[in-house]
Amino acid sequence: MNVQNRISYAFALVAVLALAGIASSLKLQDFADDLFFSHVLENTTLHDFLIENYNTWSGRFTLNALMVGTINHHNVWKIGIPLSVVILCASISRITVGKFDLRITVLSVFLYLFIPKEVLANGSWWVTGFYNYLLPAAAMAYSLSVFIRKGSVGWIEGSLSLLCLSLSCFSEQTSIATLAASFFLIVFCREYRRSFSYVYILSAVVLTWFLFSAPGNFHRFQEETWRWMPGFESESLVTKIIYGYDRIHQAIVMPNSIIFSLLCTLCLLLIYRDEQRTKTGNFFALVLLGHLVLMLLIRLGVAHLGESFYNSDLLNPHRWISYSRYASYFVTSLVILGVCYALAISAIRDNEYIKPFSIVILGFATVLMVGFSPTVYASGMRVLYLWAVMILSASCFIFYRLYGNDRSLINNVIICAMAAYVLSI
């Protein structure tokens, strides 16, 4: 075993210990969804619950079956949560490198732990959130890591990938992301036009149709509208888009949105490394730099820009009519355009950058679509979970394309990430 392998295994051990420490602190909550689903089978059978739930509340058939069937077996989710994080991060490394890479996996794990705590608490460490957000995200990442592999796909790996669709395509955000990503790759990359890809897309379409065609979806929409946002069905398209963008705005300007700041930093590097940089590139570089400076000042508590501008609090009647709120929307939209510009220009030079470009676009789309639900605000921070994971994936991809050949730099970055995590505990 050479020195580099020993270093990689040492990093992996630290990552495992970090996840084990988190897993040891996990527990079922004695209220809300954890309480409901842990007792739901006391007066009914699993079969009857699933049929009734599909017809009256949700199309998440397989996820609900897995959740209510295993939630009272604590070892299932105590092991399943950290294992899903590992599968998710290992899949990110496969998408990034083209094969499993231990160091990129470890780096992904520690960057994952820097996703805003409120988002992780809702989408990853909360037991019900694990079944509905982390698990389908991990399944999506694995299935796409197989789909994105060039050349023929072995029948074992292909079967596992299709099996994962039975989880990822039974969650609204991951099902849309899976379908969109696979369609995008087939349209723009000829190497993915193969028999497995068409079987994959057909399977995803059928399962997604099963999810969205559930009779319970309409009933749930009516119930949630009455409970959380009466009159939502009569809101205009523009209003619903504003609701969705307000959640995007929140994700971008949260003081602890470290992952998105990392993406902005990497995109800034892409622009500055462009030898054919134009005035447009300089403008977006200035936008990204300005955003990073503002976020640093907000993070340090030096800058407080009011109740609306670069404030992560959600819309209320006061902010709805505030000019500074819409100015904040405008600035953050420029930041998003700056990220997309950097990736689009890079994709022209290097076709591989199509992947992070599409990941970022889809990530924002998964949040924007939440604006069409009356629970756009009631759902809390968990609706930002998939977005954060996709921003993490894009960041890892860009970092590897820029510095993948510099092992010492990767080692140093991993050490810094580990140290920062330890200090944040």
Question: What residue ranges belong to the model's regions?
Answer:
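Start-transfer (signal-anchor) and selected internal transmembrane alpha helices
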Residues: M1-A20
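Transmembrane catalytic cores of multi-pass membrane glycosyltransferases
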Residues: A23-V76, Q173-I176, R190-A344, A365-R382, ...
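Transmembrane-helix motifs of polytopic, lipid-linked glycan transferases
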Residues: P82-T105, Y142
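Transmembrane alpha-helices and membrane-interface helical segments
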Residues: A90-S91, Y142-R149, A181-C189, T265-I271, ...
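Membrane-interface micro-motifs in multi-pass membrane enzymes
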Residues: V109-F147, S322-C340, L368-S395
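Short hydrophobic alpha-helices at membrane interfaces in multi-pass membrane enzymes
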Residues: R149-S166, R194-L202, R407-V413
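Membrane-interface alpha helices of multi-pass inner-membrane proteins
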Residues: I156-F183, V206
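Signature aromatic-anchored transmembrane alpha helix within multi-pass, membrane-resident enzymes
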Residues: E157-G158, A285-L289, I336-L337, Y341-V360, ...
